[in-house]
């Protein structure tokens, strides 16, 4: 199941840096984290769904790259984001 428009707007409102912000690293990572958590639950129930597993790995890689970019450019924003999302780093 894809992320609903309402849920996505809720996440965007929470992590946006300014009004109308949908593309900042924080927003992208927050949306990816929600999708990753949702796919993780799906994979736990459907262990042989290899196509979904591949999509999950692609999303994890995308999030990893965005977090590396944020860490390189603004360490304070990076730390705030991983603390608010509860990511282990």
Swiss-Prot record:
Pfam families: Ribosomal_S15 (PF00312). Gene3D superfamilies: 6.10.250.3130, S15/NS1, RNA-binding. SUPFAM superfamilies: S15/NS1 RNA-binding domain (SSF47060). It comes from the Bacteria. GO terms for molecular function: rRNA binding; structural constituent of ribosome. Keywords: Ribonucleoprotein, Ribosomal protein, RNA-binding, rRNA-binding. One of its GO terms (biological process) is translation. InterPro entries: Ribosomal_uS15, Ribosomal_uS15_bac-type, uS15_NS1_RNA-bd_sf. One of its GO terms (cellular component) is cytosolic small ribosomal subunit. Belongs to the universal ribosomal protein uS15 family. NCBIfam families: S15_bact (TIGR00952). One of the primary rRNA binding proteins, it binds directly to 16S rRNA where it helps nucleate assembly of the platform of the 30S subunit by binding and bridging several RNA helices of the 16S rRNA. Part of the 30S ribosomal subunit. Forms a bridge to the 50S subunit in the 70S ribosome, contacting the 23S rRNA. This is Small ribosomal subunit protein uS15. It comes from Streptococcus sanguinis (strain SK36).
